[in-house]
């Protein structure tokens, strides 16, 4: 028994900040950013536009795409590291926005790997037989965690949300398998220098870029190879590779090491920047909207985030 994606939707805030605009108040330039990251712009949420608002916009699109009633949803999981409040959860607020009552709703925090984590959790809960229609969301307002004087981090991130509707599969489509991992010993590679129990503030992003690059390549490659081997798949079986959209150099290097053909690699980092847990569902929504995916296609997701947390998932469309 496995779950399948029956609908998807993405939302990006209307405000777009190009590299040239960013260079007006940050010591950087368009060439420096593009060469190192592949990013040309990012979407930034307004001061009164919160993660729950982004989540709602993407959820409404996914519900419409799935052609289900909002009342069919019996579980909400929101993957985020930028909640509106310390409590309640974004998922709980979203439940209220959607007019739903008495269904379980909770947030999952695995940063950039959140959507892959959430997919495995949602699949397990659907497999239990207790839930039939799950709304799984990746939503982030990452710009709220940025130190705008630190050009090594502030140029990388954007805001956005992506959602999917999951139901139990009645055929061979759906989640084939997934794996998730963490390594707490490496937490200082990427973290925020604050937190509720630490100092009462959210803090700003601190990153050791070169170390993170090496870990990203190593851990995502191993995760993918293990997943393919465990399920007797080869790289040639993959129709679309949707990696976490953190940095074009990571994406390209990973595709090169795995021998994944260029036309199979989905890249949205140029326009979206790094939207953390939202990046994979946003990229999926973009791919689906292009009309390229067809029934039976094999999709490969893979992500790594702070924690360190990472994992991969294989899906038959």
Curated annotation (Swiss-Prot):
Subunit structure: Homodimer.
UniProt pathway annotation: Lipid metabolism; fatty acid biosynthesis
Reaction(s) catalysed (UniProt annotation): malonyl-[ACP] + acetyl-CoA + H(+) = 3-oxobutanoyl-[ACP] + CO2 + CoA
Protein name, per record: Beta-ketoacyl-[acyl-carrier-protein] synthase III
InterPro entries: ACP_syn_III_C, ACP_syn_III_N, FabH, Thiolase-like
Localization: Cytoplasm
Entry's family note: Belongs to the thiolase-like superfamily. FabH family.
GO CC, one annotated term: cytoplasm
């Amino acid at each position: 028994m496995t779950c399948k994606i029956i609908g998807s939707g993405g939302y990006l805030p209307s405000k777009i900040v190009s590299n040239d605009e960013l260079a007006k108040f940050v010591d950087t330039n368009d060439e420096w950013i593009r060469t190192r990251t592949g990013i040309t712009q990012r979407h930034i949420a307004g001061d009164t536009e919160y993660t729950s608002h982004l989540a709602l916009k993407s959820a409404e699109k996914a519900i419409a795409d799935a052609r289900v009633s909002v009342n069919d949803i019996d579980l909400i999981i929101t993957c985020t590291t930028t909640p509106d409040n310390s409590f309640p959860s974004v998922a709980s607020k979203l439940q209220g926005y959607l007019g739903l009552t008495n269904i379980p709703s909770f947030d999952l925090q695995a940063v950039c790997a959140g959507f892959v984590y959430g997919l495995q959790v949602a699949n397990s809960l659907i497999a239990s037989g207790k839930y039939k229609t799950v709304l799984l969301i990746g939503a982030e307002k990452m710009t709220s965690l940025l130190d705008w004087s630190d050009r090594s981090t502030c140029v990388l991130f954007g805001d956005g949300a992506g959602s999917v509707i999951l139901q139990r599969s009645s055929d061979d489509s759906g989640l084939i398998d997934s794996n998730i991992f963490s390594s707490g010993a490496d937490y200082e590679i990427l973290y925020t220098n604050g937190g509720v129990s630490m100092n009462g503030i959210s803090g700003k992003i601190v990153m050791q870029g070169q170390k993170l690059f090496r870990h990203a390549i190593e851990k995502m490659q191993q995760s993918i190879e293990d997943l393919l081997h465990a399920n007797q798949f080869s790289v040639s079986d993959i129709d679309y590779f949707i990696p976490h959209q953190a940095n074009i150099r990571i994406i390209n290097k990973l595709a090169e090491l795995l021998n994944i053909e260029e036309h199979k690699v989905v890249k949205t980092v140029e326009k979206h920047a790094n939207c953390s847990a939202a990046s994979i569902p946003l990229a999926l929504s973009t791919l689906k909207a292009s009309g390229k995916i067809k029934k039976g296609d094999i999709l490969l997701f893979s992500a790594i985030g702070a924690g360190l947390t990472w994992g991969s998932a294989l899906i038959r469309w």
